[in-house]
From Swiss-Prot:
This is NADH-quinone oxidoreductase subunit B. The lineage of its organism: Bacteria, Pseudomonadati, Pseudomonadota, Betaproteobacteria, Burkholderiales. Transmembrane segments: none annotated. The gene is nuoB. HAMAP family: NDH1_NuoB (MF_01356). GO terms for cellular component: plasma membrane; respiratory chain complex I. It is found in: Cell inner membrane. SUPFAM superfamilies: HydA/Nqo6-like (SSF56770). It comes from Leptothrix cholodnii (strain ATCC 51168 / LMG 8142 / SP-6). One of its GO terms (biological process) is electron transport coupled proton transport.
Length: 158
């Protein structure tokens, strides 16, 4: 029995929810799952011009240390089980950002036999960033949209 069983929905729980969600938005640690050319723009977002660190984000190499997965690029059928495996290794709470036309719906390779038509068929996606490839500004906007979504979540009072 956790804190959600003790506290009923009210002022205290909503204040605690606000505090917890604020801390989650300020410390997203993304794991890069770069599969194609969109990964270059993802790296560009981490460089000095856009500096993704100012949002409290630090790219992590391990799924156990990250809470955000950025899927960037064409997802092939052979790579889909690896994507699911990495997603399952991430700790809760976890979020997925799909970056680019290929990750969103297959892109130019939509009709190919070897391409998964969207990574949302393998893992649940929270935010879609359109473009081919999307710019670093679009990725940052998608991250801001994800932070707004996290702020609206109910952590304790479900």
């Amino acid at each position: 029995m956790g804190i959600e069983g003790v506290l009923k929905e009210g002022f205290v729980t909503t204040s605690v929810d606000t505090l917890i969600n604020w801390s989650k938005t300020g410390s997203l640690w993304p794991m890069t799952f770069g599969l194609a050319c969109c990964a270059v723009e993802m790296m560009h977002a981490g460089a000095s011009r856009y500096d993704i660190d100012r949002f409290g984000m630090l790219f992590r190499p391990s799924p156990r240390q990250s809470d955000l997965m950025i899927v960037a690029g064409t997802l092939c059928n052979k790579m889909a089980p690896a994507l699911r495996k990495v997603y399952d290794q991430m700790a809760e709470p976890r979020w997925v950002l799909s970056m680019g036309s290929c990750a969103n719906g297959g892109g130019y390779y939509h009709y190919s036999y070897s391409v998964v038509r969207g990574c949302d068929r393998v893992v649940p996606v929270d935010v879609y960033v359109p473009g081919c490839p999307p710019t670093a500004e679009a990725l940052l906007y998608g991250i801001l949209q994800l932070q707004a979504k996290i702020r609206r979540e109910n952590t304790i009072a479900r």
